[in-house]
Amino acid sequence: MSIDLSTAQSIITKALETGQQHGFKPLTVVVLDAGGHVIAVARQDGASNNRFEIAQGKAYGAVALGMGSRALMERAEQQAYFITAASAALAGRLIPVPGGVLVRDEAGTIMGAVGVSGDSSDNDEIAAELAIKASGLTAQVA
């Protein structure tokens, strides 16, 4: 099962609300289905340019490799050659820093991923993780 539009929009709303509640810089949030296709995206007023591409890259890498982008960052630190090769295989659409969080259902099946960009990578990840959990789904950051 993949994320539907209604769920994607709910996740986006909750991520943006989380950012506002925590005083984060303006965010861009992208929700992808299990195949890496964009379901929904929102960019807050004032978010800097290219945040869509960064958020999408965080989410795309997560869903493509089956791990949160924090785990991808850790993998890049340990095995840079793997991330370089994976990035090439994914046509450069992999951004291995926190902020790309897998979405799993109650059975543990990957439903898609959420990518957030706009503040620090750690804060981006917080917004994604809390939004996924608030939507009743499981967030996998690592």
How would you name each of these model-derived features?
Residues 1-142:
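Flexible, solvent-exposed loop/hinge segments and secondary-structure transition points
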